[in-house]
Amino acid sequence: MSSQYSNVENLSPQTIRQVMKELQDMETTPPEGIKVLINESDVTDIQAFIDGPAGTPYAVGVFRVKLTLSKDFPQTPPKAYFLTKIFHPNVASNGEICVNTLKKDWKPDLGIKHILLTIKCLLIVPNPESALNEEAGKMLLERYDDYSQRARMMTEIHAQPAKCGAGASDAKDDDGPSTKKHAGLDKKLQDKKKEKLLKEKKRMLKRL
């Protein structure tokens, strides 16, 4: 991969080793609800699956996120993006994530694991005060039920495990018998969800 798309050539060997070690540690002992994907040819391109936290509008979803390390990482923070579409105050239309940990609160000793856990926490406690999606931020503050319904609908449409590739909790057997065993059941559940979504969409259109 050329340096036009990657900063791997600009990172020190020590930084590359440190990042790779942390990723391998996370693969061996994954944080709850997070599955990291290792790209051994380019450690500056880090992707992970994050399970939507229980008790939130994102609970049924699995979200793919991407971290892009800057050329002087860890002195400057990486950029973080949701690759899965999501309705959230702190996520821009291009997927960019706004969180203080990756801005003013960044410290060079914060690792990849801390960043991914922070993103997961953002799904639990959004920050409408620093909204990149103003509509979502305003809706969260003024009409939470509508916000929750919209976020849940987007999650059910875009963040299903089959669309994202795999769930974080499926780290051990993405292609094993467990996946095949649940495929039929997942299809039935998704068909039911589609019916429910169509009804919800019709209701929302009537209210517009």
UniProtKB/Swiss-Prot annotation:
<dbReference type="InterPro" id="IPR023313">
    <property type="entry name" value="UBQ-conjugating_AS"/>
</dbReference>
<feature type="region of interest" description="Disordered">
    <location>
        <begin position="161"/>
        <end position="193"/>
    </location>
</feature>
<dbReference type="InterPro" id="IPR016135">
    <property type="entry name" value="UBQ-conjugating_enzyme/RWD"/>
</dbReference>
<comment type="pathway">
    <text>Protein modification; protein ubiquitination.</text>
</comment>
<dbReference type="GO" id="GO:0010458">
    <property type="term" value="P:exit from mitosis"/>
</dbReference>
<dbReference type="GO" id="GO:0061631">
    <property type="term" value="F:ubiquitin conjugating enzyme activity"/>
</dbReference>
<keyword id="KW-0547">Nucleotide-binding</keyword>
<feature type="active site" description="Glycyl thioester intermediate">
    <location>
        <position position="98"/>
    </location>
</feature>
<keyword id="KW-0131">Cell cycle</keyword>
<dbReference type="Pfam" id="PF00179">
    <property type="entry name" value="UQ_con"/>
</dbReference>
<keyword id="KW-0808">Transferase</keyword>
<dbReference type="GO" id="GO:0051301">
    <property type="term" value="P:cell division"/>
</dbReference>
<comment type="function">
    <text>Catalyzes the covalent attachment of ubiquitin to other proteins. Acts as an essential factor of the anaphase promoting complex/cyclosome (APC/C), a cell cycle-regulated ubiquitin ligase that controls progression through mitosis. Acts by specifically elongating polyubiquitin chains initiated by the E2 enzyme vih/UbcH10 on APC/C substrates, enhancing the degradation of APC/C substrates by the proteasome and promoting mitotic exit.</text>
</comment>
<feature type="domain" description="UBC core">
    <location>
        <begin position="14"/>
        <end position="160"/>
    </location>
</feature>
<keyword id="KW-0067">ATP-binding</keyword>
<dbReference type="GO" id="GO:0005524">
    <property type="term" value="F:ATP binding"/>
</dbReference>
<dbReference type="GO" id="GO:0016567">
    <property type="term" value="P:protein ubiquitination"/>
</dbReference>
<dbReference type="InterPro" id="IPR000608">
    <property type="entry name" value="UBQ-conjugat_E2_core"/>
</dbReference>
<protein>
    <recommendedName>
        <fullName>Ubiquitin-conjugating enzyme E2 S</fullName>
        <ecNumber>2.3.2.23</ecNumber>
    </recommendedName>
</protein>
<dbReference type="InterPro" id="IPR050113">
    <property type="entry name" value="Ub_conjugating_enzyme"/>
</dbReference>
<keyword id="KW-0833">Ubl conjugation pathway</keyword>
<keyword id="KW-0132">Cell division</keyword>
<dbReference type="GO" id="GO:0031145">
    <property type="term" value="P:anaphase-promoting complex-dependent catabolic process"/>
</dbReference>
<comment type="similarity">
    <text>Belongs to the ubiquitin-conjugating enzyme family.</text>
</comment>
<feature type="compositionally biased region" description="Basic and acidic residues">
    <location>
        <begin position="170"/>
        <end position="193"/>
    </location>
</feature>
